[in-house]
Swiss-Prot record:
Chain's gene name: Polr2D
Record keywords, A-Z: Chromosome, DNA-directed RNA polymerase, Nucleus, Transcription
Family listed: Belongs to the eukaryotic RPB4 RNA polymerase subunit family.
Record organism: Drosophila melanogaster
One GO BP: transcription by RNA polymerase II
Subcellular location field: Nucleus; Chromosome
Spans traversing the lipid bilayer: none
Protein name per the record: DNA-directed RNA polymerase II subunit Rpb4
Length: 139
């Protein structure tokens, strides 16, 4: 029976941006980016000589990302990510803002508690407005 060393145990709390060690070097993706990757894989398969059937998990994930993606084309996805990367956001916050697209600072802070105290409402409102503009201008 093995016991964990209390020194190795870190409280995991996304609200405080505390994540397990395994996530330190991990990158985050927007749901829109995941959809783009899955769509690319699906189109590759459709154009292959021998089309293979996708797993149920793949198809459900594809449907989920199609339903919940906020950005519909590569240019808008890249533009939104670029905008968010210019801000002083943790990669978790960047992904959460890009996936949830809250409309008001209060909503953003309720959904992403780590933003509280790190951003003034006006600064956060500008970020949210910029994201909203990108969403509304996509084709």
């Amino acid at each position: 029976m093995s016991f964990m060393n209390p020194v190795d145990m870190v409280d995991e709390d996304a609200a405080d941006l505390q994540f397990p060690k395994e996530f330190e070097n991990a990158e985050t993706l927007l749901i829109s980016e995941v959809h783009m990757l899955l769509d690319h894989r699906k189109r590759q398969n459709e154009s292959a000589d021998e089309e293979q059937e996708f797993s149920e998990v793949f198809m459900k994930t594809y449907a989920y990302t199609d339903s919940f993606r906020k950005f519909k084309n590569k240019e808008t996805i890249m533009s939104a990510r670029s905008l968010l990367m210019q801000k002083k956001l943790h990669k978790f916050e960047l992904a959460a803002l890009g996936n949830l697209c809250p409309e008001a600072p209060e909503e953003a802070k309720a959904l992403i508690p780590s933003l509280e105290g790190r951003f003034e409402d006006e600064e956060l409102r500008q970020i949210l407005d910029d994201i909203g503009t990108k969403r509304s201008l996509q084709y």
